[in-house]
Amino acid sequence: ERFAADYERESGQISVPEIKEKNGIKIAVIGSGPAGLSFAGDMAKYGYDVTVFEALHEIGGVLKYGIPEFRLPNKVVDVEIDNLAKMGVNFIKDCIIGKTISVEQLEEEGFKGVFVASGAGLPNFMNIPGENSINILSSNEYLTRVNLMDAASEDSDTPVPFGKNVAVIGGGNTAMDSVRTARRLGAERAMIIYRRSEEEMPARIEEVKHAKEEGVEFLTLHNPIEYIADELGKVKQVILQKIELGEPDASGRRSPVAIP
């Protein structure tokens, strides 16, 4: 499937699916991530007049801001977006539904349906001492600034810190994307800190494998309990607590238990 898709894209002869006759019904899609784009494509095939509203300045949602170029090149995403445009899907960027325009205004403009695909963009923090220190970022902010705002450039208006020692808390795919990005930005020592064992990591096996091949260190069965900042307020140290695994929790994985 990957070979066929790449061949079609590189040949420039991309097929557009059959579109039913336009029915004149306007549908609004809030968000241009995977769910929004998939829904837009399906509705367009059935003849609906679809408009996708994106809050950011790039169409693609998490496909653009959350997944690094080395894992999903933007040009691949852009081809899919171009296909949707050829199918008749309209795209409006820099538009926040509820602020730039209201749902009531969409209804006044004739939209008969609204599909909310805004994603789960709010990060979860641990609420531990020192968490507000300078250079502590959520993966969401870090990847967005690097992937979408060119924050790795010295001329960027929103530069990210180029830490020589970088710790990423968590063991999912987003954690792997973050730590591998840090390595590419020059981190001499990049480490995953995870409260369970490697077997319980939710990240895909191949993502863990690639991270190890790139020199990422893994410290499992440890969890941060405090961050220490220097006199300028920049994080310089993290205090960890050792963890052991107890009985399985609701996720089916063994629950982390702090060792006194």
Where are these regions (language model features)?
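N-terminal Rossmann-like FAD-binding beta1-loop-alpha1 element of flavoenzymes
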Residues: 25-52, 174-183
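Conserved Rossmann-like nucleotide-cofactor binding loop
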Residues: 35, 58, 121, 174, ...
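Glycine-rich FAD pyrophosphate-binding loop
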Residues: 48-64, 190-199
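Conserved beta-strand elements of the Class I
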Residues: 28-30, 167, 191
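Iron-sulfur cluster-binding cysteine motifs and their immediate structural context
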Residues: 1-5, 51, 55-58, 88-91
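A Rossmann-like FAD-binding core segment of flavoenzymes
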Residues: 75-125, 138-141, 146-157, 161-162, ...
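Non-heme iron-sulfur electron-transfer modules
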Residues: 1-18, 57, 129-140
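A short, basic/flexible loop-to-alpha-helix module at the beginning of a structural domain
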Residues: 8-27, 144-164
